[in-house]
Amino acid sequence: MKLKTGLNLTALLLFMISVAFPAQADTQKMYGIRGDNLSIATQMPAPRTYSVKGQTYTTKSGNEAKSYIKEGLASYYHLKFDGRKTASGDVYNSKQFTAAHKTLPINSYALVTNLHNNRKVIVRINDRGPFSDKRLIDLSHAAAKEIGLISRGIGQVRIEALHVAKNGNLSGAATKTLAKQAKTQEAADRLVLKSNTLFDNTSKSINALKGTEFYCLKMLELTSRSQANKLITQLALANIQTEVNRSGNKYEIYIGPFDDKTKMAQVRTKLQKMANNKPLIVYTYKN
């Protein structure tokens, strides 16, 4: 009886842990981007005001934090800071993918793109700073190395906010970029997408249908742009947007949005047959 009770308590504890912490993500496998494993759910505390060197800062919360996109200068921590405490209470580790930002929530995440070479990294915000008018973010040594910032010391970057829910789903400004980087259906399914995520010029008629579910298709690993264009021509879709993008030495097709799940499924089946079952991802989002 005691053994059974102990097992039940262990099972309950494991369940509580699984609810409290999202599943870890291999960001390189899912999106082709190295970074933090996204294992800490983002909390949204009320905005807090603090002062450093006579300058006052107010932290972001709610939709303001989630929608954050900004371009500006980034640098990185000197190795001498290894082992020092950060604003979150963490000890700074130069080998981890972390960063300091003045106003984004602690334990939220950011997708950082080096605008010089388009290399990307995902970091967890665990510190405050940099307290300089010129720099937006300071990266850990590992994060700076990943995007090729070490030799330059400082560089122009784009910062896109990313939040992690307790169930592991991802939301925020960075989901638009991650959607185009997704390598698997699982990676796409973790993204909480808005109607304009994959296409910048979605039709006004689609945008008007608030609260409706829409679907987009992405076919991966096509060998050439001509192959992608040939498939689009063969599909002969009327009033459905298509787009061809290069991904490394391969090409991808984006098709949609569809407001009819049956129509989307028909196009998906036809496309897979024509392309000999190349990898295909279905995106679902709500307007």
Curated annotation (Swiss-Prot):
Q: Which PROSITE patterns match?
A: SPOR (PS51724)
UniProt keyword annotation of rRNA processing present: no
Annotated Gene Ontology cellular components are: cell outer membrane
Q: What InterPro entries does this protein's entry cite? A: RlpA (IPR034718), RlpA-like_DPBB (IPR009009), RlpA-like_sf (IPR036908), RplA (IPR012997), SPOR-like_dom (IPR007730), SPOR-like_sf (IPR036680)
Signal peptide range: 1-25
| Gene Ontology molecular function terms on file | lytic endotransglycosylase activity; peptidoglycan binding
Which is a Pfam family this sequence falls into? Answer: SPOR
EC code: 4.2.2.-
Sequence ranges assigned to domain SPOR in this UniProt record: 209-284
* Keywords of the record: Cell wall biogenesis/degradation, Lyase, Signal
Which is a GO BP term held by this UniProt record?
Answer: peptidoglycan metabolic process
The entry sums up its family as follows: Belongs to the RlpA family.
Q: What does this protein do?
A: Lytic transglycosylase with a strong preference for naked glycan strands that lack stem peptides.
What name appears for this protein in its UniProt entry?
A: Endolytic peptidoglycan transglycosylase RlpA
User: What is the scientific name of the source organism?
Assistant: Haemophilus influenzae (strain ATCC 51907 / DSM 11121 / KW20 / Rd)
Q: What is the lineage of its organism?
A: Bacteria, Pseudomonadati, Pseudomonadota, Gammaproteobacteria, Pasteurellales
